[in-house]
Curated annotation (Swiss-Prot):
Organism: Lacticaseibacillus casei (strain BL23)
Active-site residues (renumbered): E160 (proton donor), E375 (nucleophile)
BP GO terms, sorted: lactose catabolic process via tagatose-6-phosphate
Protein name: 6-phospho-beta-galactosidase
Highest taxon in the source lineage: Bacteria
InterPro entries: 6P-beta-galactosidase (IPR005928), Glyco_hydro_1 (IPR001360), Glyco_hydro_1_AS (IPR018120), Glyco_hydro_1_N_CS (IPR033132), Glycoside_hydrolase_SF (IPR017853)
Cellular component annotations (GO), alphabetically ordered: cytosol
Homology family: Belongs to the glycosyl hydrolase 1 family.
Length: 474
């Protein structure tokens, strides 16, 4: 049965500066935490990515043609302040003015992220989210952007803070690649929320008339079985990745039950509790009461079972199905129940998880007035057909099926009261992936990376139909 979306519902594609722009050494751009990390790994490079730095007009024209009303983009902090602070690079400032003007020319509203995984190198070396200098410089950079880019009406402070903190210090898949440091993970989580709060409060004090929010990666966590120990493992995983952030950014306080779960994880790893001050908590509370929206990035769900051994993480970075391992000391082990479909990268396909997280925000965090689904999509191994022409349309029925199921779950949540106002597919075009390079394709538009030619995927045509009719077909 087809489902109806509200008439004011907006749809578009999502991008991130480091994953699409390329041009990492052009026009005075400074280095970021990934540059040295990827050089040493030697597996893949962030250039040319999708060459959005030079081809943004081509991609925005495609977005307009295929029914997009909105787009997610991020500002590369190190294009504006190559060193993270100090001297401004005017060529970087000029680029983003051109980008936003082109969005307007194509009748597409940009939702602009200030930090999308790309801390400037100097600040990363100073401690990244564990450094007070980083937090202060981030607020100063945000203030500059608010004053400079007055044409932007929708701002996002941080993209997926949980992905940064957990992958930097728990799983070790993001630089500095430390693992098992739950103390650093939770301190980074708190510090991110302090920086976010300071920026929200600053923006509101400037009375610029736009809106500001935050984007969270929220994967619903379920117990592997009905046993009490598996239920508790799911609660611990949820506290690590979801609950502390939801409490801080959407309720303005850390609930005692959440802090007890955090302390249990830290105690099991013989690590100290994170530090906070009354002044920081006051800022967090103030920000939660004036946040305009929350973005939900949801791709998959997790199932947890009790586990009492040492932490072990094996990241599936090449699409070898079944190669992932995730066991965390003091938390639990990820284990999929039988019958749950997965992608080649071991991400579960479970639309119910989208419904459950949207309803959780609606029911448990009533302060936040509006929700957007700011990322959702499926990574696939795709290739250009032989003898492709500019008119070639690449078939991707798996993507259409995936997005249809998740949009349907989202529509059910809207029907049941969740105030979801828009959906951004990850991703607009094929892009560079932080830990998978160029093998994992998410785009509505296929990018032939050697030539940078764009080709339409069938999903782009399907997406246009949904966007224009507001009807999700059977």
């Amino acid at each position: 049965m087809s489902k109806q979306l509200p008439q004011d519902f907006v749809m578009g594609g999502a991008t991130a500066a480091y994953q699409v722009e390329g041009a990492t050494k052009e026009d005075g751009k400074g280095r970021v935490l990934w540059d040295d990390f990827l050089d040493k790994q030697g597996r893949f490079k962030p250039d040319p990515a999708a060459d959005f730095y030079h081809r943004y007009d081509e991609d925005l024209a495609l977005a307009e043609k295929y029914g997009h009303q909105v787009i997610r983009v991020s500002i590369a902090w190190s294009r504006i302040f190559p060193d993270g602070a100090g001297e401004v690079e005017p060529r970087g400032v000029a680029f983003y003015h051109k980008l936003f003007a082109d969005c307007a020319a194509h009748h597409i509203e940009p939702f602009v992220t200030l930090h999308h995984f790309d801390t400037p190198e100097r600040l990363h070396e100073a401690g990244d989210w564990l450094s007070q200098e980083m937090l202060d410089d981030f607020v100063a950079y945000a203030k500059f952007c608010f004053e400079e880019f007055s044409e932007v009406k929708y701002w996002i402070t941080i993209n997926e803070p949980t992905s940064m903190a957990v992958q930097q210090y728990t799983s070790g898949t993001f630089p500095p690649a430390e693992s098992g440091r739950f103390d650093k993970t939770f301190q980074a989580e708190h510090n991110q929320m302090v920086a976010h709060a300071r920026i929200v409060n600053l923006y509101k004090s400037m009375q610029l008339g736009g809106q500001i929010g935050i984007v969270h990666a929220l994967q619903t966590v379920y117990p592997y079985s009905d046993s009490a120990v598996d239920h508790h493992a799911a609660e611990l995983q949820d506290a690590l990745e979801n609950r502390l952030y939801l409490d801080g950014t959407l309720a303005g306080e850390y609930h005692q039950e959440t802090l007890a779960l955090v302390k249990e994880i830290l105690d099991a790893n013989h690590q100290p509790m994170f530090q906070s001050t009354p002044q920081e908590m006051k800022a967090i509370d103030e920000a939660a009461h004036q946040l305009d929206f929350v973005g939900v990035n949801n791709y998959f769900s997790k199932w947890l079972r009790a586990y009492h051994g040492k932490s072990e993480t094996i990241h599936n970075g090449d699409g070898t199905k079944g190669s992932s391992v995730a066991r965390l000391q003091g938390v639990g082990e990820e284990k999929l129940p039988d019958g749950i479909e997965t992608t080649d990268w071991d991400w579960s396909i479970y639309p119910r998880g989208m419904y459950d997280i949207l309803m959780r925000i609606h029911n448990d965090y009533p302060l936040v007035p509006v929700t957007y689904v700011t990322e959702n999509g499926i990574g696939l191994k795709e290739s250009l057909p032989e003898n492709a022409t500019p008119d070639t349309v690449i078939e991707d029925p798996k993507r259409i099926d995936y997005v249809k199921k998740y949009l349907s779950a989202m529509a059910d949540a809207i029907h049941d009261g969740a105030n979801v106002k828009g959906y951004f597919i990850w991703s607009l075009q094929d892009q560079f992936s932080w830990t998978n390079g160029y093998s994992k394709r998410y785009g509505l538009f296929f990018v032939d990376f050697p030539t940078q030619n764009r080709y339409i995927k069938q999903s782009a045509e399907w997406f246009k139909s949904v966007s224009e009719t507001h009807i999700i077909p059977d």
